[in-house]
Regions:
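Conserved ABC ATPase signature
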Residues: 131-135, 139
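Conserved ABC ATPase "signature" region
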Residues: 62-67, 110-127, 178-179
Length: 361
């Protein structure tokens, strides 16, 4: 393989047996799954912090681990930047000292211009002389990101960097992560069990459960697969890409074009023709056999039922909007009352749409 991960490792009763593509191109691959699935074990193995029983790790053509050949590049020489949820900053150093520690681990020492660029990218200018204990959780996360970037890493591993933050701190740091994704050319593996974070940041998704990869592919394709959410605690929903078609200044609305249909959301500060990612959660989709009249919902879309997955009292219904896919979560009673089956034409009433992390009615 040109680039990718193959790992087998046993830890007490837990068995990891995972293989997936990573590291051949820039962008974010989300390692997605419930707690205890093996995500952090994979991160530690790639970083060289644990030695798996069997493994092959190739990133951008460079072999970092090949147990069959007896090859294992030491962690300090792998040039893998890692950001953990507890940040692991040095408490005795100020922010500038923590950043310089990262630059000292780079193969070529970062010059002042690169350091200034990273400081500016992450908005750290006013924090350089402060100690970690005086920083908010979001500020500490940004410093940890900066330290990892100044290593000039061949890949960046983000192990649930927002898990310890409250909603306000997450909202603070997500825009910086988005800038990082757009302005660097580093392959990133982002560990999360938050579909909202995956929707905003990732291009690809690797779904892991009980130590095994059960699916990998684009976030748009995998988010609509019923088999990946049935019976799991993960909230079903889809991630879609839409294009800004028009702005209604009089009502402070933006009209998005999605598979030839119109989706209306509150005003987005982007130009006509630009693309945006949206997320529609399955519980926010109602189904009707005929187009509802006299309702407050702005978004009512004609769709076709393509698949149904029943779990307990609920039914997840996959819907086709031309080439796009939606998912509705309804009760089994509603499923029976509407007599839904693959091929049934219905209308999807969208109660809310999330754009860029903001929920819109």
């Amino acid at each position: 393989m040109s680039s990718g991960i193959q790992l087998r490792h046993r830890l007490d009763a837990f068995q990891l047996d995972a293989a997936f593509e990573f590291g051949n191109s820039p962008g974010v691959s989300a390692l997605f799954g419930p707690s205890g699935a093996g995500k952090s074990t994979i991160i530690n193995a790639i970083a060289g912090l644990i030695a798996p029983e069997f493994g092959r790790i190739v990133i951008n053509g460079e072999t970092l681990l090949d147990t069959e050949r007896g090859l294992s590049v030491p962690a300090r020489a792998r040039r893998i930047g890692v950001v953990f949820q507890d940040t692991r900053l040095f408490p005795h150093l100020d922010v500038q000292g923590n950043l310089l520690y990262g630059s000292r681990r780079a193969p070529v020492k970062s010059d002042a211009s690169r350091t200034a660029a990273v400081v500016g990218l992450l908005g750290l200018e006013g924090l350089l002389n402060r100690r970690p204990r005086t920083l908010s959780g979001g500020e500490r996360s940004r410093v940890a990101l900066g330290r990892a970037l100044l290593m000039n890493p061949r890949a960046l591993l983000l192990d649930e960097p927002l898990a310890a933050l409250d909603a306000a701190r997450k909202a603070e740091i997500l825009p910086y992560l988005e800038r990082l994704v757009h302005e660097t050319q580093i392959p990133m593996l982002y560990v999360s069990h938050s579909l909202d974070e995956v929707a905003r940041l990732a291009d690809r998704m690797i779904v892991i459960d009980k130590g095994r990869v059960i699916a990998e592919g684009s976030v748009f394709d995998l988010s609509a697969r019923l088999d990946l959410v049935a019976g799991s605690p993960l909230l079903p929903g889809v991630i879609l890409q839409a294009k800004i078609a028009a702005h209604d200044e009089a009502h402070a609305l933006t009209e998005l074009e999605l598979a030839g249909e119109s989706v209306v959301v509150p005003r987005i500060a982007k130009a006509i023709g630009e693309t945006v990612r949206i997320r529609i959660d399955a519980p926010d989709v109602m189904l009707a056999l005929s187009r509802p009249e006299g309702v407050s919902a702005n978004n009512i879309l004609p769709v076709l039922v393509t698949a149904i997955e029943q779990t307990g009292p609920n039914a997840d219904v996959q819907l086709a909007l031309k080439e796009a896919r939606l998912v509705a979560r309804i009760t089994r009673r509603s499923l029976e009352r509407l007599a839904l089956k693959p091929g049934t034409a219905v209308f999807a009433v969208i109660k809310s749409v999330t754009v860029g992390g903001r929920e819109h009615l």
